[in-house]
Structures are given as C-alpha cells and as structure tokens.
Amino acid sequence: AELGKDSRRKVSTHRVDVGEPTQIREFARAAIAAHPGLNIVINNAGVALLGGFNEVDQAQMEWLVNINFWGVVHGTRAFLPHLSQQRAAHIVNLSSIFGIIAPPGQTAYCAAKFAVRGFSESLRHELSMANSPVKLSVVHPGGVLTNIVRNSRTGTGITDNARRAESIDRFDAIAKTTPPAAAQRIIAGIEKNQPRILIGNDAKFMDLLQRF
C-alpha cells in the first residue's frame, strides 16, 4: 500500500490461502494480468506450531505442512510457466534456519522447512539443466523479529499456559534481524543469484556448524 503512493509503481493486493491450489492458480492469473512483466516470485507464507511431536495432533501437523511446504510448491507451480517465458526470472522460496538444523520441539516446522530446502535445491538443478531463464534461491532466515511465534498455534497436548509466554520471550531474545534488513539481504541474494541466502549471523553460524 505504501508503494502504491508512488505513481510510478503499480501495486495490487490479493488475499490468498496458499494451501489451496485453486486459489493460488487464480491469484497467479490475476497477478500476471495486472503485472505482465512479473519476473520474480517470493513464496514467503509461513506459520508456527508450539509443541513437540507427542504434543501436536495430526491435523495440526498437516495444517502447518500444508502452508509452509505445499504453499511453496503451489506458488512455484502456478507461476513457473509464466516465468519461463521471461528473458530472466527468479523464484525465491523461504525455508528457515530450521531447514538447516533440527532442534527438539520443532518436528512439524523442521519437516516442512527441510522439505522446502530439498524441493528448492532439486528444482534449481532441474532449471539449470534445462537452460531455463528462471533462477532459484532458497532463503534460510535465523531470528527475524516478526510475529510468527506470537501468532503460532499451540499443540493440543500442551496444558501449561506459561510455555507459550516463555516461547515468545526466548524468540524475542534471539531475534536480532529486522524485517527490512532481511528484505535487503534477500534482494542482494537475488541480484547475485545465490543458491542459498542466509539471513543473520545465527543462520550463517549454523550453516557452517552443520557441515562438520
């Protein structure tokens, strides 16, 4: 909306459930019609779930994976045909530091974010082998100061209300990167065509650590 105040830019907004393929396809058609020169797609939707494997039920895990993983797949599939017709284009898929390491208490989130990483890295190779004009980057943010933890759902097996507050406090203590700084890092990564974009010193450290 702020960008729309600049008359040189055309901005359109759309409300979409990324877990619904039909909605994503309709969104892609509308976005391409409004912006025929569209050549960058960023799959960024994500949710969080508080609780270990035995504390979340199957429906909650499927809800998270449907958004965090399948939303990325649906968005990529919907826009890829159009992007492939451009002279140059880029897909950016958001994974996480938890797509690099897998701490306890994050089974659903890690499963989805590791899946995003694997999907993105494999597709990047496929696009390269096909000499496609579409490049692809996968982003691994560390602690970025957003509301994802505050807006998270709580596992059905958790009865201690204090755990949610503790989780928010821990996240706020380690989330040092601001959203604008994260956005600038992603833009720089696109410009350099980086396969893996790491955001924050914590992500860089964990990326290095998991190699040993």
Segments predicted by a language model, with ranges:
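A glycine-rich helix->loop->beta "capping" turn
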Residues: D6-K10, A30-N43, L49
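The beta1-alpha1 cofactor-binding region of Rossmann-like NAD(H)/NADP(H)-dependent oxidoreductases
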Residues: R15-E26, Q58
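Substrate-binding pocket helix/loop in short-chain dehydrogenase/reductase
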Residues: G52-F53, D57-W63
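Active-site loop immediately N-terminal to the catalytic Tyr-X3-Lys motif
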Residues: F53-N54, I101-A108
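Active-site helix of classical SDR
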Residues: T76, A112
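Residue(s) in the substrate-gating loop at a strand-loop-helix junction
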Residues: S96
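SDR active-site lid
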Residues: S128-N201
